[in-house]
Amino acid sequence: MKKTDTNVLKRVEINGVQYEVVRNDDNCLNVEELSEKLTDYFDPYDYVMGDYAYEKVRLKGYYEANNKKATPINNIKKMDDYIKNYCSYGSKIFLIKKIK
């Protein structure tokens, strides 16, 4: 998992939850937009990844590898495979990790 451009944002609060910014390609993370799109569906996840393509953001939740809820499709160790296979070439990616 590569880390990029985390020098601008290190931690953010979204809807009352603290997150660490792990990855933020070209500073694409828009906290205001994310606060509207980050619903309670993502509450159980340890990470939320967003990919921007064609000026739209798509979100996906991931669990830590050691979380008993982790499966091959939501294990954070498989995120790079997801990006390679399902994200548009050149899309900007951000990854935030819930601070517990």
Task: Show which residues each predicted segment covers.
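N-terminal leader/targeting segments and the first structural element of proteins
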Residues: 1-53
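A broadly conserved detector of short glycine/acidic/proline-rich loop/turn motifs that flank catalytic sites
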Residues: 25, 63, 100
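Helix-rich interaction surfaces within compact, conserved domain-sized segments
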Residues: 71-100
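Short, structured protein-protein interaction patches enriched in aromatics and acidic/basic residues
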Residues: 51-65
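Acidic, Ser/Thr- and Gly-enriched intrinsically disordered low-complexity segments
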Residues: 37-38, 42, 47, 67-75, ...
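A residue-level signal for beta-strand positions that form part of recognition/binding surfaces
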Residues: 18, 56, 93
